[in-house]
From Swiss-Prot:
Cited function: Catalyzes the isomerization between 2-isopropylmalate and 3-isopropylmalate, via the formation of 2-isopropylmaleate.
Name the record gives this protein: 3-isopropylmalate dehydratase large subunit
Originating organism: Buchnera aphidicola subsp. Rhopalosiphum padi
Catalytic activity as recorded in UniProt: (2R,3S)-3-isopropylmalate = (2S)-2-isopropylmalate
Catalytic class of the enzyme: lyase
PANTHER family tied to this protein: 3-ISOPROPYLMALATE DEHYDRATASE, HOMOACONITASE, MITOCHONDRIAL-RELATED
Subunit: Heterodimer of LeuC and LeuD.
Protein's pathway: Amino-acid biosynthesis; L-leucine biosynthesis; L-leucine from 3-methyl-2-oxobutanoate: step 2/4
EC number: 4.2.1.33
Length: 471
């Protein structure tokens, strides 16, 4: 039988399998952060258990951290408790921790790949839904719950049902100013937030092949917003070039052996997929979400749809509810929407290529005085903040009026100091826009880094026309 990439990785990690039942899979890499791990470690202590493979377990602080200070007290008492507990847990169980004093500290789904922890063919888990990001390297990666975190800590295995295979081929010649974020938002808009439920999605096609690793990570990161368990892109020369020489990547003769194996991690011709889709993105424009779900998305030059556009009564009611919450009227143009804040960051779009693309838009420009704009590099001295400062990107952002912050999840979620106030509207490069995601009453519009940068005049602007716009 011809196997898909997913089936190859799944089968290679089976520890135990019973007919018509879930398999027990070996887990190659377990990533932790301060929010979803404390209860798991407490349970280990109560049951007098140890971590089976501490060298295959890595932790970082990202969700709760202050992005204005490295002071553990800066994010409030609850955040401090969670971070202190993570320090205690990692010390007791001999787990490597990227804490606030570690210059390599950053967002978990940024530091994993940049340090070479993430490798093709691996199984990777984390107590975070956007673990699908690592699938960009041809790794089977997915988010898990706290009870599963405990199970992996103790056994280095996890019970998993086989999932269905979905293939999404992306073809066409991308126009200027259209990004990976636009492509994946467009696909989510077509398939819906449950379109990938029960599936592992493999992305392929000429457009994917031409993407750099940062762009591929954006695509796989957002696959979870289609309801998919995981996403995969077959490793190729782009993957190998990114990984070579990184701290935890194989070295010397082991590198050559690894690449030889990684080249076998492709879906065989005529392998079976339960569903297949092909999208031509040749005529795609920059995308922006208008509602409270990632699939409520339009091209920047379109109008908010009339409720009668939706034939399905559920979608019609959701659209009406979204417009009420977002304070938008059907028939209004997206370019008429005024914003209060700009956020460039998150595990979706805080990597060096994201910063470079936004900096090109912002060079020699100034944000409006009524706008607050913050930029969050995804990591410290790894591949983002320090390299960006060496290139002078920080100066471009600061000169434009942005706050150049420390690594962390920040305004992606209303869990730290960086929140929207009630009624505030944000152009955000994050991944979720449900009610209150960025703060109670906050209104989130998901966009690419360059579209976020183009919103500097206090409203959404088609980045392709930015030079013709004025304050």
């Amino acid at each position: 039988m011809k196997k898909t990439l997913y089936e190859k990785i799944y089968d290679a990690h089976i520890v135990h399998e019973e007919k018509n039942n879930a398999s027990i899979l070996y887990i190659d890499l377990h990533l932790l952060h301060e929010v979803t791990s404390p209860q798991a470690f407490d349970s280990l202590r109560i049951k007098n258990r140890v971590v089976r493979q501490p060298k295959k377990t890595f932790a970082t602080m990202d969700h709760n951290v202050s992005t204005e200070s490295k002071d553990i007290n800066a994010s409030g008492s609850m955040a401090k408790i969670q971070m202190q507990q993570l320090i205690r847990n990692c010390n007791q169980f001999n787990i490597s921790l990227y804490d606030l004093n570690n210059p390599k500290q950053g967002i978990v789904h940024v530091i994993g790949p940049e340090q070479g922890m993430t490798l093709p063919g691996m199984t990777i888990v984390c107590g975070d839904s956007h673990t699908s990001t690592h699938g960009a390297f041809g790794a089977l990666s997915f988010g898990i719950g706290t009870s599963e975190v405990e199970h992996v800590l103790v056994t280095q295995t996890l019970k998993q049902q086989r999932l269905k295979n979905m293939k999404i081929q992306i073809k066409g010649k991308i126009k200027n100013f259209v990004t990976a974020k636009d492509i994946i938002l467009f696909i989510i808009g077509k398939l819906g937030t449950s379109g990938g439920s029960g599936y592992v999605i493999e992305f392929c096609g000429d457009v994917i092949k031409k993407m750099n690793m940062e762009e591929r990570m954006t695509v796989c990161n957002m696959a979870i917003e289609m309801g998919a368990k995981s996403a995969l892109i077959a490793p190729d020369e782009t993957t190998f070039l990114y990984l070579k020489g990184r701290r935890y990547s194989p070295q010397g003769k082991f590198w050559e052996e690894a690449v030889k194996y990684w080249k076998t991690l492709i879906t065989r011709s005529k392998a079976f997929f339960d569903k297949e889709f092909t999208f031509d993105v040749s005529n795609l424009s920059p995308q922006i979400t208008w509602g409270t779900s990632p699939d409520q998305v339009l091209s920047i030059n379109e109008k908010i749809p009339d409720f009668n556009f939706f034939k399905d009564s559920v979608k019609k009611n959701l659209a009406r509810s979204a417009c009420d919450y977002m304070n938008l009227k059907p028939g209004s143009y997206l370019t008429d929407i005024k914003i209060d804040k700009v956020f460039i960051g998150s595990c979706t779009n805080s990597r060096i290529e994201d910063l470079r693309s936004a900096a090109k838009i912002l060079k020699n420009k100034k944000i409006s005085k009524n706008i607050k704009a913050i930029l969050l590099p995804g990591s410290g001295t790894g591949t983002v903040k320090k390299p960006a400062e060496k290139e002078g990107l920080d100066k471009i952002f600061i000169d434009a009026g942005f706050e150049w912050r420390l690594p962390g999840c920040s305004m992606c979620l209303g869990m730290n100091n960086d929140k929207l106030s009630d009624g505030e509207r944000c152009a955000s490069t994050s991944n979720r826009n449900f009610e209150g995601r960025q703060g109670r009453g906050g209104r989130t519009h998901l966009v690419s880094p360059i579209m976020a940068a183009a919103a500097i005049y206090g409203r959404f602007i088609d980045v392709r026309n930015l030079d013709s716009e004025t304050n």
